[in-house]
Amino acid sequence: MRSILAATVVGASLAAASLSVAQEAQKVGPDEVQQALVGKVWEVELPDGSSATERFNVDGTVTIHGGLNDKGYWRLWEEGYCTTWFRMRNGAERCFTLDRTADGKYRVYKPNGEISMTILGTKEQ
């Protein structure tokens, strides 16, 4: 009887932990990128803690200033968005996935799963 009770408690704890993580961050696809991030100025934090400002323009151009300085192009992708910068990555395109945290920040992930940046807030251009 004790082992059944212990298994029930452990199972309930794991379920609660899974629910907590699921509520913490929601995967973001291209529809939300289009609605919430395109045509906005992003205030971002880079992985090294430095700040930058990124302009994600409606015309498909993008600029970043601060910890990095570059310009290039972006496009929507089935799982998020892709960028091609003039200098960064020698002009190679890279696609990113995103999630939105419970406090409204967007975390942007590289293909290898590392965080590329965290969007702390956005404002209209």
Language-model segments: residues:
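Lipid interaction determinants
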Residues: 2-3, 7-11, 17-125
